[in-house]
Amino acid sequence: RNDRFGGSLQNRMRFVLEIIDRIKMKCGPDFPIMVRYSGEEWMPGSRKIDETVEIAKMLEAAGVAMLDISAGIFDAPGPTMDPMYYQEGWNTYAAEAVKKAVKIPVCTSHTLRHPEYCDKIIAEGKTDLVGLSRQLIADPYWADKAKAGKTEEIRTCISCLVGCWKESLMIKREMRCAINPAIGDERFLNLQPARKSLKVAIVGGGIAGMEAARIATLRGHKCTIFEKDNELGGILRTCCMVPPKSKMKWYMDWIRRQIKELGVEVKLRTTADVDKLKEYDVVLCGTGAKTVIPQVPGIEKAVRFEDVLVCTKKNCEYWPEDGKREPAKIGQRVLVYGNHYGATDTAEAIALRGKEVILVTEDSEFAPDIEPIHKEVMKMRFAGGNGQALEGNPIKIPVQIKLNTSLYEIKDGEVTLINNRFEKETIKVDTVILGKTEPDSELYDSLIAAGLKVANIGDSKMVRNVRGAMTDGAEAALILDDDIFMNANNMLSCALPTDVKRQMK
């Protein structure tokens, strides 16, 4: 702009200062005004922290009562929405810089999750207040639990942006949360007690299975989880090997704690079959997804992604030593086949180890079903960058992405690919990793054939994401006994939801 609202900082501040002046004119000089603005905008030529500090001084002089320091602009979706890649409190530095320059209170925001961390940055003088948004969607009783000293009961936001953004605001529908079924669905607040307590078998201790067990037990059913592996968690356990997904541990810790506190019977290293399950009133089948094995020559030379993403840490709580298997060995130049989390997470994890990665997908678009903000940051990192405002470990060798392409033949040291124009290409690779998945419904089909009362939940029903699996489990647990649904208008016996009442005791 070249008018009085553009160019110099004073001109660019004119609009907001005139708004502040008019508010005070209408509401009185003592009417408190808070201004929220970004510490840095994270685009070429955009505002940096030095100018942000000067703006803070101008706003204080204009009579503003408090400053709330955010991050980013619309064209910088990473720092604006801060998905899983961004560490807790990453934006606190901006509030700290502003606080040193003004005497009015300063608030910080962006990926603040734990009360202990919030107390720490306030005590260190980096901020006066903390601002929470997504965390209060994941657990609206965050402050109550913190005040009561029940921080271990807080359902910590994992920054996935699936429920609150991709499947709500982005498509202009009511708010949802990937890890809290009660958000936007009041049926889950005060749960309708079971009309008849049922013996419920839940096959699979992943997201869907654990959430189903939690809700069903709260309603009064007797649940048993059958898990073939040596620990609960399912696909969540791969968070150990994929650094950007480390926040998944927060949800896994919370849901496993709920299962333990509720007294759900858990049978680890146990494979369920029709004979074992006949004694139960109902079966919820959450057996997850299985790796797609393309029928091409040499496929036996490939390895599955779940055999690569195996934790090697000693005494890892998610991968007990008893029964822990060794990860598959991979070479330096690796082809990863697939286009959902199994493939993209594997590609990122091994690229961070310095491997040269080629990601091959039959789709015409990269990762079409992955949450868009994560996808944008992932693409920046795959291209050899580190994402806007991100610090730490970048991918040193860019990940190649081949669209509209499938496997044709695998040989020792090379792979032949074929694209949608039937053009073939042979490339040198040391290892092929299969990362495409599909529902593993074999047990479900056998239970249906045997005439058992069964529901299919999670990835064994349809491969989706955390919210898809969690919602499946919660919904199934709500209708176990003759499809009873709660009437949100007649459950007013307590202001706290059923699970929060238990947690706060």
Where are these regions (language model features)?
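Short phosphate-binding/catalytic loops that engage adenosine nucleotides
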Residues: 28, 64, 103, 221, ...
